[in-house]
Swiss-Prot record:
The keyword Membrane does not apply. GO terms for cellular component: cytoplasm. Its main location: cytoplasm. This is Probable transcriptional regulatory protein Psyr_3028. Gene3D superfamilies: 1.10.10.200, 3.30.70.980. SUPFAM superfamilies: YebC-like.
Amino acid sequence: MGAQWKVKHKEAAANAKGRTFGKLSKEIMIAARAGADPDMNSRLRLVVEQAKKASMPRETLERAIKKGAGLLGESVNFERLTYEGFAPHRVPVIVECLTDNINRTVSEIRVLFRKGQLGAAGSVSWDFLYQGMIEAVPAAADADPELAAIEAGAQDFEPGEEGATLFLTESTDMDAVCKALPEFGFTVQSAQLGYRPKSTVDGLTDEQMAEVEAFLEAIDNHDDVQNVYVGLAG
């Protein structure tokens, strides 16, 4: 794992698709506050790319943009909250939320953390890097990820899923790297800012791993949770 936690089991992953669209809709609405045109709003453009990769229906995507931009006469009032703490067996976790009711979210997240340990701000984030994470696929067979990373200004790169490459950037450089990668033979599929662990917990037994995964799944299932980052090997 070692970064953003994702549902592993096929049935759970299928059920999670609707939640994924809900999470992306929130991000789109917030980004669209700064303008409904992705060409003029880099933050919105990046979230729209994520939504397209997730196969969000076009109608859902466009409605979220219009709602966030105030074109439907509805107000969007979400607040960002970040929680730090530990899953069972001292596995470090960072949880990002978007909520329209802070008191509700605080109360419910505290309950979910009873099987782990909720920490103070900074209790685990010191052991994570806040980075841009760009998933891109080669547009040509001879595209060189190392050359592309150097020339586009990425910090590093590593193999991604299904033949993609994950380019890692400084948080402030992500948009510039996204724009530069096509010049060096890569098509950007998604890009987001997030946390990557500097070190990970390993050596857990199957039973212990099952406890950690059950904890993470319960957190991720909460409607207000956007992202779960975990320092867990494997």
